[in-house]
Amino acid sequence: MGLSFSGARPCCCRNNVLITDDGEVVSLTAHDFDVVDIESEEEGNFYVPPDMRVVTRAPGRQRLRSSDPPSRHTHRRTPGGACPATQFPPPMSDSE
């Protein structure tokens, strides 16, 4: 058994909400779904076995877009493998 929502199109405005073709806003809760038999061939195939699933991209690290901010856990390294030394100006003396 599985859950299926019929007669609705996705809404990009709010999370967990669908807007039906009639314009009705529906919150996505368990009460808004109909119970269906996922092994049934009547309405289409609801279950795809893992070995038959289509992979659209290879798993792995995602590349950052230029608009993405760097992660605070990302450390940039020099080609030698060591972190570059931070250079600060010399401290000011009392005479300055």
From Swiss-Prot:
Membrane topology: Lipid-anchor
Subunit field text: Interacts with cytoplasmic envelopment protein 2; this interaction is essential for the proper localization of each protein to the assembly complex and thus for the production of infectious virus. Interacts with gE (via C-terminus). Interacts with gD (via C-terminus). Interacts with UL56.
Main subcellular location of this protein, as a coarse class: virion
Lipidation (N-myristoyl glycine): 2
Segments of skewed composition (Pro residues): 87-96
Motif (Di-leucine-like internalization motif): 18-19
Protein name: Cytoplasmic envelopment protein 3
Phosphoserine modified-residue sites: 40
Post-translational modification: Myristoylation and palmitoylation (probably on one or more of the nearby cysteines at the N-terminus) enable membrane-binding and Golgi apparatus-specific targeting and are essential for efficient packaging.
GO cellular component: host cell Golgi membrane; host cell plasma membrane; membrane; viral tegument; virion membrane
Keywords attached to this entry: Host cell membrane, Host Golgi apparatus, Host membrane, Lipoprotein, Membrane, Myristate, Palmitate, Phosphoprotein, Virion, Virion tegument
GO BP terms: anatomical structure morphogenesis; viral budding from Golgi membrane
Region (Disordered): 57-96
Similarity field: Belongs to the herpesviridae cytoplasmic envelopment protein 3 family.
Asp/Glu-rich (acidic): annotated segments: 37-43
Highest taxon listed in the record's lineage: Viruses
Subcellular location: Virion tegument; Virion membrane; Host cell membrane; Host Golgi apparatus membrane
